[in-house]
């Protein structure tokens, strides 16, 4: 049986596991059960020498300012140029941002746009992960808004993979769907308010739709409540608990272990995500104390540009988009 020394912050949160006969002056525990000292987390194992093994406690990395940005794009060439500028314009240290880029089974040039962005700006970030492998030939044949259980399962898998990647490195997590456009202050605001473990910036649309449900029905989908419109029109301002946050949100790294997008119910993956959190008594919050961007559904880039120059003209300066976009 091994002897275990439990590291602290000064030792970079590592466990050293020694052979039974090794004499140590430090406090020792005689057990194989590392989870006894740090529950719910996996351990990164490295062999050192002379039978000594090192385990890094990834779960203890709670104090970090590094963030994974999940860019999950399929058939999004119409909005990716504007979206990627919004991501690039975040006023947060890029060396502390890690891009997780996943695209699959496209019928347009989304992959090419993403690769061009990586080629131009990738080295400015802390790291970049890119994967364009196919997940399901069936997905490629489906219409853009053909929502069905198979598609929910694939999208849930994609989202879960990005969560696991952030969890592996102990980073915070931020995702914005590719038709969700966030202003440069967004990630900074999320980090400033990270005491709210799951937090979404309110993103309005031209209609009454937004990236949250104030309450839900028995199946976890939207249900009417007067406070929905009060939040949307900022009659209630600040960070408020809601029953669903979706599309764009921040997750504190110590909450990633509780995230799941698949519960076997074959529902929308965002419904499962929120339902799992509610069952674990983890509150989701919406923050609307500032303008953080907007949400659109355009399938044509020219239509998007027209919409930005017309309906959203008042908001464009907030995004600091380069003049050559139009």
Model-derived segments and spans:
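Short beta-strand-to-loop acidic/aromatic patch adjacent to the donor-nucleotide binding site
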Residues: 170-181
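C-terminal catalytic/acceptor-binding lobe
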Residues: 2-30, 34, 236-249, 253-326
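Active-site-proximal specificity loops/subdomain of glycosyltransferases
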Residues: 117-169
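A structural helix-start
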Residues: 73-81, 103, 107
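Cell-envelope/extracellular polymer assembly enzymes that use nucleotide-activated donors
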Residues: 66-68, 98, 272
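A conserved acidic beta->alpha catalytic loop
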Residues: 102-119, 132-136, 180
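Conserved catalytic core of nucleotide-sugar-dependent glycosyltransferases
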Residues: 163, 183-262
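Short, acidic, metal-binding catalytic loop of nucleotide-sugar glycosyltransferases
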Residues: 85-96
